[in-house]
Amino acid sequence: QVLEIELSISYDVDPSSLDKDKMPPIMDASVYDIVQKVVMTTKFKAMEGLALEIARRIMSNYTVAELVSVVIRRRQLFIPGDVQSAEVEITVDREDLGEK
């Protein structure tokens, strides 16, 4: 099945430390690698479980991340009626994961 995944990661940044030639600490392909690994190697009955696991892995791999939002959208539905897609959005912070 084809899933669309949107990911938002929030963290504090000192504007004076930003450099146009350097990427912020978590803006690289490793984020994609984490999401791909979770999607390809784990099975969940509900999209909520997948979204939560993606958020957990991002938070555990990037200590700078304070808040992670994951949206998962599935366009291919096998249910009757005029439904275009199913979507779930989960937002977690470190407190939600029992880290503070």
Label every model-predicted segment.
Residues Q1-K100:
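N-terminal, polar/charged subdomain of small-to-medium soluble alpha/beta proteins
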